Amino acid sequence: MPLGPEERRLLRLIAFLYRSNPYPSVEGTARQRRRARRRWKNRQKQIYALAERIWGTRQEDQLVQAIDQLVLDTQHLVTQQLPDPPSQA
């Protein structure tokens, strides 16, 4: 399934979020490095949750649009001209 411009924009935004949180440097004492990794990991979890919300909202919107289209298609089928039933003569 090819991605449209909206999906590409969302993917660029998600990629930017991940790039904005680089892995911590190896400088400092063991305790400082451990704390930096812990903070980095917590930020990664937040970014992951945010990315899920961004991408999940898009999928929900598509699902709502698909359901609306099905409802319209069904209404169109119901209102089409149907042939008269055979008469019992």
From Swiss-Prot:
Entry keyword annotation includes RNA-binding: yes
Bridged cysteine pairs (disulfide): none
Main location: host cell
An annotated GO BP: mRNA transport
Keyword Nucleotide-binding: no
Segments of this protein annotated with the region Homomultimerization: 13-21
GO CC terms of this entry: host cell cytoplasm; host cell nucleolus
GO MF annotation list: DNA-binding transcription factor activity; RNA binding
Compartments (UniProt record): Host nucleus, Host nucleolus; Host cytoplasm
Motif extent (Nuclear localization signal and RNA-binding (RRE)): 29-45
InterPro entries listed in its UniProt record: REV_protein (IPR000625)
Motif, Nuclear export signal: chain positions: 70-82
Keyword set, alphabetical order: Host cytoplasm, Host nucleus, mRNA transport, RNA-binding, Transport
UniProt remark on domains: The RNA-binding motif binds to the RRE, a stem-and-loop structure present in incompletely spliced viral pre-mRNAs. This region also contains the NLS which mediates nuclear localization. These overlapping functions prevent Rev bound to RRE from undesirable return to the nucleus. When Rev binds the RRE, the NLS becomes masked while the NES remains accessible.
Function field: Escorts unspliced or incompletely spliced viral pre-mRNAs (late transcripts) out of the nucleus of infected cells. These pre-mRNAs carry a recognition sequence called Rev responsive element (RRE) located in the env gene, that is not present in fully spliced viral mRNAs (early transcripts). This function is essential since most viral proteins are translated from unspliced or partially spliced pre-mRNAs which cannot exit the nucleus by the pathway used by fully processed cellular mRNAs.
Description of how the protein assembles with itself and partners: Homomultimer; when bound to the RRE. Multimeric assembly is essential for activity.
Protein name, entry field: Protein Rev
